[in-house]
Amino acid sequence: MGLSFFLSPALLIFIFKQNSKVDKFSSYQKFPPVETADEDGLLAIGGELSVERLIDAYNRGIFPWYDASQPVLWWSPDPRMVLFPQQLKVSKSMKKLILNNAFEVTFNRDFEAVIENCANIWRQGQSGTWITEEIQKAYLELHELGTAHSVEVWDGNNLVGGLYGIYLEDKKVFCGESMFSTVSNASKYGFIKLVEKLRAEGVKLIDCQIYTAHLESLGAEEISRKEFLGFLA
């Protein structure tokens, strides 16, 4: 992802306070209700990227999105871009690539390489990355706990595409975070393979967070935040 920020004057700024004299768990300050997010979806500012806070955030329909020059920004947009696995759209050209086994796809083989590539890949219209070293470290910890998952797309021994996200397995919801591709169609190929896998596992919904025409072309759609939160209940 990546965006320029405009904070509405009406924004309710919620600062997480930390007290070093209190242990980590008892000092944990909860997120405000998602209904208090501003019109752009910005809900809260501040706090640390601990495993506990991140897991709590995703289970509440909240995700971090900011760049290295900013404090941690927490978002819960309305509407929410999602993909229902059964609504996946696969173009004729992609079907041909899949039929011909154009790439090899693996899962959780090299999470660290995937998130590093997502951070470093050049994206049109972006001068930097939101996947900071802090983000990479936090999500690597989540991966080690089995919560963050990766998809790798290979051309021989070369990693040419991939994506990663958070798997709320108990809720049958996968929250996509970022993808990259160094050759044409590699990330899309990996995404299609992931959706097929998740569909077989009974996943109800893939959270795509915000609208893009690319996601819409794959079958994703916008639903209300209220409807989205129903899948996390």
At which residue positions do the language-model features occur?
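N-acyltransferase acceptor-side catalytic subdomain
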Residues: 6-233
